[in-house]
Swiss-Prot record:
The modification Phosphoserine is found at residues 209, 215, 217. This is Saccharopine dehydrogenase-like oxidoreductase. Belongs to the saccharopine dehydrogenase family. The keyword Oxidoreductase applies. The modification N-acetylalanine is found at residue 2. It comes from Rattus norvegicus (Rat). InterPro entries: NAD(P)-bd_dom_sf, Saccharopine_DH-like_oxidrdct, Sacchrp_dh_NADP-bd. One of its GO terms (biological process) is glycolipid biosynthetic process. Keywords: Acetylation, Oxidoreductase, Phosphoprotein.
């Protein structure tokens, strides 16, 4: 509930950025769909008042709500000015942080939110940042009773909650899951804003930091229940989907593993093994992708190479990334499907002495991943946080979406907003 000290329940930070403008629009859409009595006071935040006003005016025009600009607060805030971050945090119950790459701009927001007793949700897909924030700030956030919830966009809500959904739908104990992401596009093809491209460049260019972080974490291994999940080759064929697949290099593996660790250590849930892949079509696509991948991995090793990759995203990504991002038509014609193949054991069957005897297939389907599904996921995570507080982990801390929302109604809300979870098949073998 908003108070005189905290006039806004929700603040969208980075609202004038490429992704932030879509998150702003989605918050406005959610507010319009709510009854008057349940609408939340909210604001947008960023460096330029003029740009923030333009974002609100654009959303107002698109949604047909002429009064939107007068209904939403504006906070001037700069990532390079800690005092302005503090002032923003003091005015909000929850900050939706849309400013990336997070490895460069994320930590000051996390720090300001914790110091000022404000919770924060981001849409980061960078494992190094996500894991570092947990190591550095989990205890501090818990002491303050605030929640820092990362990767609450397309990275990695479909994967993280998809595994939990699969577990909940299995009539037995789920022990292992493989997910296969398929991106669908229309005649005009796919295009992704270069902010995601930059995050990938700097992430691959600094893989050593993530390895070092994990090596000093001293975490106990999570037990393997049942048959060990075999990793596929770098290029494998998925017969069920009639497509070649490669490992998915986003944050899904990191996030799901952290969720499974949390649920096992804190709620005594049986941990689930996980592997993430993305389908790439036929053999011609595989060959093209191999050349592109080798090209990228060579350039990303060197400073000058990274500068070239950042400067010419369209050239080096073969047209998939650009500084302008996708057109509205490209977004309208795009969608994603994430298919989960799970295995486990029926009740009463020992996982120690037997092979898995249950198979289950589930799917998560949704609209364009980066700028339609991501805002939906982020905003519904925020709505869930604000409305299902009693079902969140007790005491605060730094969490994955699955750890934070495993006992909430987030999946139900996503189903109602176009990100659909469903069971395709389930059988004993």
């Amino acid at each position: 509930m908003a108070t005189e000290q905290r006039p806004f329940q929700l603040v969208v930070f980075g609202a004038s950025g490429f992704t932030g403008q879509f998150v702003t629009e989605e918050v406005a859409r959610e507010q319009m769909a709510s009854e008057q009595s349940s609408r939340l006071p909210w604001a947008v935040a960023g460096r330029s008042k003029e740009k923030l006003q333009q974002v609100l005016e654009k959303a107002a025009q698109k949604l047909g709500r002429a009064t939107l600009s007068s209904e939403v607060g504006i906070i001037i805030c700069d990532i390079s000015n800690p005092a302005s971050l503090d002032e923003m945090a003091k005015k909000a119950t929850l900050v939706l942080n849309c400013v990336g790459p997070y490895r460069f701009y994320g930590e000051p927001v996390v720090k300001a939110c914790i110091e000022n007793g404000t919770s924060c949700i981001d849409i980061c897909g960078e494992p190094q940042f996500l894991e570092l924030m947990h190591v550095k700030y989990h205890e501090k956030a818990a002491e303050k009773g605030v929640y820092i919830i990362g990767s609450s966009g397309f990275d990695s809500i479909p994967a993280d909650l998809g595994v939990l959904y699969t577990r909940n739908q299995m009539n037995g104990t789920l022990t292992a899951v493989e997910s296969f992401l398929t991106i669908n596009s229309g005649p005009e093809g796919l295009c992704i804003h270069d902010g995601t491209w930059k995050s990938a460049i700097y992430g691959f260019g600094d893989k050593g930091s993530l390895r070092k972080l994990r090596s000093v974490s001293n975490l106990k291994p999570v037990p393997v229940i049942g048959s060990k999940l075999k990793r596929r080759w770098p290029v494998s064929y998925c017969r069920e989907l009639n497509s070649y697949a490669i490992p998915f290099l986003g944050s899904d593996m990191s996030v799901v593993k952290r969720t499974q660790r949390y649920l096992h250590e804190n709620l005594e849930d049986s941990p689930v093994q996980y592997a993430a892949y993305i389908t790439v079509g036929g053999i011609t696509s595989v060959i093209k992708l191999m050349f592109a991948g080798l090209f990228f991995l060579f350039f990303v090793k060197f400073s000058i190479g990274r500068q070239l990759l950042v400067k010419f995203p369209w050239l080096f990504s073969f047209g998939y990334f650009s500084k302008r991002g996708p057109t509205q038509k490209q977004m309208d014609e795009s969608s994603f499907t994430m298919t989960f193949f799970g295995q486990g054991y029926s009740h009463g069957v020992s996982a120690e002495k037997n092979k898995p005897n249950i198979r289950i297939c589930t799917q998560v389907k949704g609209p364009e991943a980066g700028y339609v599904a991501t805002p939906i996921a982020m905003v519904q995570a925020a709505v869930t946080f604000l409305n299902d507080a009693s079902d969140l982990p007790k005491g605060g801390g730094v969490f994955t979406p699955g750890a934070a929302f495993s006992r909430t109604k987030l999946i139900d809300r996503l189903n109602q907003h176009g990100i659909q979870f469903s069971v395709i098949s389930s059988s004993e073998v």
